[in-house]
Amino acid sequence: METTTPKSLYMMTLGCPKNRVDSEVMLGTLRHRGYTLVQEASDAQVIVVNTCAFIGPAKQESVDSILEMAELKKSGACKTLVVTGCLSQRYGEELSKEMPEVDHFLGTSAYAQIGDLLAAEASPRQVIPDPDYIHDANTPRINSMPKYTAYLKISEGCDNACAFCIIPTLRGGQRSRPIDDIVAEAKQLADSGVQELNLVAQDLTAYGHDLPGRPKLHDLLKALVQVDVKWIRLHYAYPRIFPDELIEVMASEPKIARYLDMPVQHVSDKLLLSMKRGRNSEFLKGLLTKLRERVPGLVMRTSLIVGLPGETEEDFEMLKEFVKTQRFERLGVFQYSDEEGTAAYDLPDKVPQKLIERRWREVMAIQKRINREQNKKLVGKRLEVLVEGPAPETEHLLVGRHQGQAPDIDGMVYINDGLAYPGEIVTVEVTEAHDYDLVARVVERPDPKQREHTARDAHPAPLPVAAMQRPAPRAE
């Protein structure tokens, strides 16, 4: 027997954009069943915490968030607390014993069952099947990003066996979506007003090897550029498989953003071998050079890990020199987290935590100088910017992003002079540079026909901004 009374729902999402997509599928599924989405957890009868368990700090954040939401069962309207995602997949059985206040634990392949689970009067407390699910274009989904941008998950799981990574255990082997299904969802997003598609997967460049006919990422991109969006951005493109055909599509198709998120993790051959990355430093440097040469204006984001077991001072100096030489426009640095169940967990020569933190600070300081120098070179330049809306700090500024700035993880462009609709792609002139952000003025807006298309569901009039108001620089 199923309950039919509509309930209020609050969703908390932790972790990566791929996890966000899972949350959006749950939101769509539950709204389809009559649930009302609320902005405050204290107003919700049902709270869902979609967790991350990639590294130690992420696990702790997930546990803290669950406990925070559990307090609302005592004092607020919450009647049902559901924990989903990677933490449930990894520790669901243990957590069910330690957290009696949680009603249900769903693994990474069970989130699509959440509607049936909540509708039934009697349902299991743990639903943690082997990870084998991925949604399709027919699955209800609510885009939780600003309506002009969206993540598009093209595959789930990973067939790599990187020594430091627990993801294949949590998410299963690679499962690619067929090209026509991905294109169908992309069209749905475009019809809803999305201007920017951010392609995500555990391993973007391995796309298709598990499908009949073994299509490649460049085949998918050739199909996606036919969709009515302005930018298509590539995230998590592993360097191990990077054919020339992919580089050619990136260089020749205007809709493919001049931006690439490609995690290299380290440059020491000894550590790359122990990490099981499948490529050496010579290959990585050659690929980076090829990308810079063949894709003019490419903004490169990468991620590195410091403190891997066996990382010596010589290895670390090599890494710092690599960062100085390559001058990545965007860089994320992770402190190694010793995760039980990974190959690296059993490696000898662990690096002390204080030393890991020192190395992290050193690399970030180098990158901060690089960011500042690169941003200063943009002053006086003209850029195309996707306007997102009023700045969080003040309604007298607009914020947006140029092609070299991905949502959530990179800097912003603050617009302090001109008119623009949220969702418009406008031409700006950069007037000021900070370490991570830029300040600019609008110099050209789209033609009226495009303006009508992008603003159809936005504001009734373009948003003005006060001339020459400066945003406060961000501390990062």
UniProtKB/Swiss-Prot annotation:
Predominant location: cytoplasm
Ranges of residues in domain Radical SAM core: 144-373
Gene3D superfamilies recorded: Methylthiotransferase, N-terminal domain, Nucleic acid-binding proteins, tm_1862 like domain
Limits of the MTTase N-terminal domain: 7-123
EC number from the UniProt entry: 2.8.4.4
Binding site for [4Fe-4S] cluster 2: 158, 162, 165
Record-level GO cellular component terms: cytosol
Residues that bind [4Fe-4S] cluster 1: 16, 52, 86
CDD domains, per database record: Radical_SAM
PROSITE patterns, sorted: MTTASE_N, MTTASE_RADICAL, RADICAL_SAM, TRAM
GO terms, biological process: tRNA modification
Catalysed reaction equations from the record: L-aspartate(89)-[ribosomal protein uS12]-hydrogen + (sulfur carrier)-SH + AH2 + 2 S-adenosyl-L-methionine = 3-methylsulfanyl-L-aspartate(89)-[ribosomal protein uS12]-hydrogen + (sulfur carrier)-H + 5'-deoxyadenosine + L-methionine + A + S-adenosyl-L-homocysteine + 2 H(+)
The protein's required cofactors: [4Fe-4S] cluster
SUPFAM superfamilies: Radical SAM enzymes
PANTHER family noted in UniProt: RIBOSOMAL PROTEIN S12 METHYLTHIOTRANSFERASE RIMO (PTHR43837), RIBOSOMAL PROTEIN US12 METHYLTHIOTRANSFERASE RIMO (PTHR43837:SF1)
Protein purpose: Catalyzes the methylthiolation of an aspartic acid residue of ribosomal protein uS12.
Similarity remark: Belongs to the methylthiotransferase family. RimO subfamily.
Protein name: Ribosomal protein uS12 methylthiotransferase RimO
Source organism: Myxococcus xanthus (strain DK1622)
Top-level taxonomy: Bacteria, Pseudomonadati, Myxococcota, Myxococcia, Myxococcales
